[in-house]
């Protein structure tokens, strides 16, 4: 079973790199992240690949704003602390999360030149359809239906 786990790590890293490359191709000054937690319905950031994406975007000088229904101003500090303990390389980012987190989707999208969606929620699908900037969809928002022209999907 160990080789499979190792290949999963490589696959996850490749997906992270692919998402970053797709976002960088849009040459954004600011990226909105819709969905921070490892999966929808939780505030657990510990295994969340989007944190690695955000860190790489910031290394490229890109501003970030984010929204998550379950990672809220009330729990983000605690959630980020847990994530930083499992991913030491992301400690700086985890300390910044309270400033990056927006209370509503509209605030997160304001001024964004690109969007990445990590949770397949109806309100995130609606936002992806309504923005006029590139959207990287890692949540398979439009699975089985036509994807809007501004969306590129890569599920992870």
Go through each PLM region and give its residues.
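Structural/interface elements that position substrates and couple domains in central-metabolism enzymes
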Residues: 1-156
């Amino acid at each position: 079973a160990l080789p499979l786990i190792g290949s999963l790590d490589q696959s996850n890293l490749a997906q992270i790199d692919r998402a970053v490359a797709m976002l960088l191709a849009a040459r954004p000054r600011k990226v909105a992240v819709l969905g921070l937690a490892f999966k929808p319905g939780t505030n657990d950031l510990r295994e969340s690949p989007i944190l690695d994406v955000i860190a790489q975007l910031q290394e490229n000088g890109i501003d970030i704003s984010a929204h998550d229904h379950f990672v809220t101003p009330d729990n983000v500090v605690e959630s980020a602390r847990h994530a930083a303990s499992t991913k030491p390389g992301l400690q700086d980012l985890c300390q910044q999360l309270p400033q990056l987190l927006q209370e509503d989707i509209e605030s997160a999208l304001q001024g964004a030149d690109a969007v990445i969606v990590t949770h397949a929620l109806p309100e995130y699908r609606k936002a992806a359809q309504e923005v006029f900037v590139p959207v990287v969809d890692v949540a398979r928002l439009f699975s089985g239906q036509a994807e809007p022209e501004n969306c590129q999907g890569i599920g992870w």
